[in-house]
């Protein structure tokens, strides 16, 4: 049967209309960005009814109301950079970090709302996964970007945390160190944007770190070698670089000047463009300091560039370069003159990171990082008066009286330089390439697992032509980490992990960690509503430094070609330095989430630490005769000490404009075992003839005494005000006296020990007060001033090294562009 053309055309028209109807009636995938997640409070409880807005620029691209389980989903046909604005009754508004979303992307964001007016705080250092600080079992302090805006460096803000004693040896550019809960100054893992940044062996100079291009930093108190491997024996310090966040480019300039010929210029630029975000900074700081031959300058440059391959696959590149040079006047108060020397440093840190989140639950990260650290010390010419001592020409300083905080004093002339060919000096380098892989999977909102792998290629060198030392090392290290974290009933939070590290020098080490946080009373606006009890048990491991390896007994016997002595005395390579810690604490909301108390007890045991053992002690105590190898002493893992104490912090925010903080730490530390020359002789090997019968540790603390530079009492406070036009801050740091040494053994004009003083309470206590202020004349121009060390106390550092007196800086900030 033949179909008429008219009927055939009608059938085709019907099919066309039917197809068009299906296009409208049947749902098909649309080109829309989808943002979904769950709104919770800091303890993970869902917040139903929360309003979530997707903001693009100054307009709303979509919104949603959280369901009874806190979940939400927003669809928008827009693409580009977005911010989530989340609000709910009785909670503070949360403004999230900006992110990129394409029209076909599915993005997960989980906002956390705080009950208090205090800004939401999230830690990454504690567990490797972004975690609200209220769920963390660890002792953590977050120093925000706002605290660093008027600062030159970071030393003063490191003091604004319990358990930390920050020591700077001298003035601007002087070596800066931290001793955390009694740990050594090289037992701290330092990271910049996730890249390991300390020297091989843990040494890190905080004195040359500029505040330029720092978005803040995280202070984790306690060992965490599970996540970060070697050197995280006492703490972890994590610096971060800002990211561009404005749709339009923004340029910031800051310039200031002050006394002691101090001036500083800083320029930053940042912004976003579609998939890109970018930030760059450069600064230059100069000062003559308050001592002769102690001029300091530092130039810092940094960049942070991100690109979203997809919304869930960002790629990020960071780089930070610091170049500095400072005079090295030595311990000026011991000699009355400054040494003619210079210390130069070139430090570069960089990393490239790619991460991906697959189906909301599976997150993977790969980071390649480098650290290139080089330093040179140069003594240009000898200073002082040349006087022969025991047939050798020695240069002595002026006649001075050295006074300790313990009431003892010594008068004389100390040896500041020795005969030789000038200029002379040494140089060293510490180079590291590392690859880090992390994979974490959220099995449920209450259980997360993490696996990590870290590879390190470390190289180092030390060259001292004057002593014919030309040393090089190479180490290849691996680490495997497995960690689980979660919660039970939204009240008991746990973190359990372990790591196995294979170090090229000391072999294999295992480091477990376990943490618990229990919230018996959930946070609220009532009196005493909000109680968290926390506890941690952890071990840490630290690899020896380059110089420690060079001076170990095993290395010296190997270099001397004496494998027979190594075999006869069963001498091993230098071992890992160990730490073991447990701490308990409570975080208590006292009133309306405005007055919060944090208090805790910690107990640390540091073992297998390093002693310098002379040849006589090697023979009499250990039965090792090194006379035929012409070895006069070596480093051994024979030192052990304990450090325990209490730390507390009180925070009060009466309103959104004022924040008051204060903290206190009591530290009881004691050397339990030592075979150093001083300890083996009970402090009589280098006794001051003018102080007969008083034992002195000339270079190392004695058994039963406190380790050097660990004051038993430290504290801090800060008062911050932030208004529409005015911002002001008043901060202080306090310390009691600490044990130390003048380190002037056999250094007086007769080659004797009359310039040594008893160790107990040798370093002075201090109170350092600083004030800052900023006035915003317009949205683009503001003026600021910094008043440092208001009491002009110069005995803030170790004995013999005077700090800066009262200082001031004042300048302008100019902002161009931005949203």
PLM-predicted stretches and their roles:
Residues 161-162, 209-252:
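A beta-strand signature from Gram-negative outer-membrane beta-barrel systems
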Residues 40, 51-53, 87-91, 102-148, ...:
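Short, acidic, small-residue-rich periplasmic hinge/interaction motif at the N-terminus
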Residues 155-196:
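Extracytoplasmic beta-strand/coil segments of soluble accessory domains associated
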Residues 276, 361, 365-369, 373-377, ...:
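Membrane-embedded beta-barrel scaffold of Gram-negative outer-membrane proteins
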Residues 156, 195-221, 301-303:
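Short acidic/polar hinge/loop motifs at secondary-structure boundaries
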Residues 259-286, 291-326, 341-370, 442-453:
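Transmembrane beta-barrel wall of Gram-negative outer-membrane proteins
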Residues 487-494, 603-605, 625-744, 779-782, ...:
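Gram-negative outer-membrane beta-barrel transporters
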Residues 442-446, 454, 470-596, 600-604, ...:
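Structural signature of Gram-negative outer-membrane beta-barrels, strongest in the C-terminal barrel
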């Amino acid at each position: 049967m033949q179909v008429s053309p008219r009927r055939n055309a009608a059938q085709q028209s019907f099919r066309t209309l039917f197809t068009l109807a299906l296009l409208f009636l049947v749902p098909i995938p649309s080109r829309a960005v989808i943002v979904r997640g769950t709104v919770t409070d800091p303890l993970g409880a869902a917040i139903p009814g929360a309003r979530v807005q997707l903001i693009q620029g100054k307009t709303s691209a979509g919104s949603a109301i959280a369901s009874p389980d806190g979940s939400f989903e927003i669809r928008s046909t827009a693409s580009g950079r977005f911010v989530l604005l989340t609000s709910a009754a009785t909670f503070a508004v949360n403004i999230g970090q900006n992110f990129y979303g394409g029209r076909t992307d599915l993005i997960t964001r989980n906002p956390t709302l705080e009950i208090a007016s205090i800004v939401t705080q999230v830690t990454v250092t504690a567990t490797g996964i972004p975690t609200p600080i209220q769920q963390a079992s660890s002792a953590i302090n977050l120093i925000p970007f706002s605290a660093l805006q008027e600062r030159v460096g970071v030393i003063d803000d490191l003091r604004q945390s319990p358990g930390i004693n920050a020591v700077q040896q001298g003035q601007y550019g002087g070596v800066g160190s931290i001793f955390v809960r009694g740990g050594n100054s090289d037992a701290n893992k330092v990271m910049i944007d996730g890249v390991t940044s300390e020297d091989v062996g843990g040494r890190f100079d905080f004195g040359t770190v500029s505040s330029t291009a720092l978005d803040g930093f995280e202070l984790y108190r306690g060992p965490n070698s599970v996540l970060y491997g070697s050197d995280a024996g006492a703490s972890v310090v994590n610096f971060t670089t800002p990211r561009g966040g404005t749709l339009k480019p923004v340029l910031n300039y800051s310039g200031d000047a002050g006394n002691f010929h101090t001036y500083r210029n800083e320029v930053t630029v940042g912004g976003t463009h579609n998939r890109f975000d970018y930030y760059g900074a450069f600064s230059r700081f100069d000062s003559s300091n308050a001592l002769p031959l102690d001029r300091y300058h530092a130039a810092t440059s940094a960049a942070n560039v991100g690109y979203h391959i997809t919304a869930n696959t960002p790629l990020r590149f960071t780089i930070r370069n610091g170049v500095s040079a400072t005079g090295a006047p030595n311990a000026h108060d011991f000699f009355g003159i400054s040494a003619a020397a210079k210390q130069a440093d070139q430090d570069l840190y960089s990393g490239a990171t790619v991460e991906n989140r697959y189906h909301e639950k599976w997150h993977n990260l790969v980071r390649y990082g480098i650290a290139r650290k080089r330093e040179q010390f140069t003594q240009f010419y000898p200073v002082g008066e040349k006087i022969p001592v025991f047939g050798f020409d020695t240069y002595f300083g002026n006649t001075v009286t050295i006074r300790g905080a313990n009431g003892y004093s010594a008068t004389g002339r100390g040896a500041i330089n020795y005969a030789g060919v000038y200029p002379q000096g040494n140089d060293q380098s510490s180079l590291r390439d590392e690859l880090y892989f992390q994979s974490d999977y959220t099995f449920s909102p209450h259980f997360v697992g993490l696996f990590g792998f870290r590879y390190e290629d470390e190289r180092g060198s030390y060259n001292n032509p004057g002593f014919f030392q030309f040393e090089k090392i190479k180490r290849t290290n691996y680490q495997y980490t497995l960690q689980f974290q979660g919660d039970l009933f939204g009240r008991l939070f746990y973190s359990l992990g372990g790591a196995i590290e294979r170090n090229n020098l000391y072999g294999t080490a295992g480091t477990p960690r376990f943490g618990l946080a229990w919230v018996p009373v959930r946070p609220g606006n009532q009196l005493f509503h909000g109680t968290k009890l926390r506890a941690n048990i952890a071990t840490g491991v630290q690899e020896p430094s380059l110089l420690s390896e060079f001076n170990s007994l095993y290395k010296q016997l190997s270099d001397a070609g004496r494998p027979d002595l190594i075999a006869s005395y069963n001498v091993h390579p230098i071992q890992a330095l160990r730490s073991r810690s447990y701490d308990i604490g409570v975080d208590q909301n006292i009133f309306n989430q405005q007055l919060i108390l944090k208090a805790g007890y910690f107990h640390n045991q540091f073992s297998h630490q390093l002693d310098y053992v002379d040849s006589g002690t090697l023979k009499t105590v250990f039965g090792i005769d090194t006379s035929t190898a012409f070895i006069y002493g070596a480093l051994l893992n024979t030192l052990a000490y304990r450090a325990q104490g209490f730390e507390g912090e009180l925070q009060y925010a009466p309103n959104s404009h004022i924040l008051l903080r204060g903290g206190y730490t009591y530290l009881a530390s004691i050397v339990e075992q030592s075979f150093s020359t001083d300890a083996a002789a009970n402090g009589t090997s280098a006794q001051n003839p003018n102080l007969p019968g008083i034992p002195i540790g000339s270079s190392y603390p004695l058994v039963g005494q406190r380790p050097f530079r660990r004051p038993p009492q430290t504290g801090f406070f800060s008062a911050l005000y932030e208004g529409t036009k005015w911002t002001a801050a008043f901060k202080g740091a306090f310390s009691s006296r600490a044990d130390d040494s003048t380190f002037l053994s056999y250094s007086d004009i007769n080659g004797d020990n009359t310039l040594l003083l008893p160790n107990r309470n040798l370093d002075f206590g201090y109170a350092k007060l600083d004030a800052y202020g900023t006035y915003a004349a317009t949205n683009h121009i503001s003026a600021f001033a910094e008043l440092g060390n208001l009491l002009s106390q110069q005995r803030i550092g170790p004995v013999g090294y005077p700090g800066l007196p009262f200082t001031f800086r004042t300048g302008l900030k100019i902002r161009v562009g931005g949203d």
